[in-house]
Amino acid sequence: MYDVHVIFNTLPGELARFGQLLGRNGVGLEGGGVFGVEAHFLVEEGEKARRVLLDGGFNVQAVRKPLIRKLKQERPGELGEIAAALAAQGVSILTQYSDHANHLILLTDNDKLAAEITGPWVANAKDQFTS
C-alpha cells in the first residue's frame, strides 16, 4: 500500500476530478482524506497512481509507503498511547488517517524508528497490510 499526497487546486470539483480520474484508470482508494487542499489517499498501486495523476495535471507531492498499524479499539485513549510512544522517542507524526479496514495509517518524520516503536501495534492485527 502507498500513501499518495496531492495538493489540490482551490477549485470546486477537484476531489471529484481526482476520484473519477483514478477510477477510470483502475486505481481504487483504500482510505484517506482531504485537509484543506492537502489530500492523502491510500492506494495499492502507488506508481500507477502517480503517473495517472501527473498526466491528469495534479500536483503530486509524494508517493510513499506508510506505516500501517491496528489499534485494538477496546478503550478510549489508544491513539494517544501510540502517539505518545512515538513522541517519547522524538518521532513526529506528519499525517494520520484510517483505511477502510480500520487500520491506522501513519506518515512520520522517521519511519524506520517509528516502525520499531510501533511494533506492539502490529501484533494487534496480523494481515497482509501490517508489517
Language-model segment annotations:
Residues 1-131:
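A conserved regulatory-domain signal marking ACT and ACT-like small-molecule sensing domains
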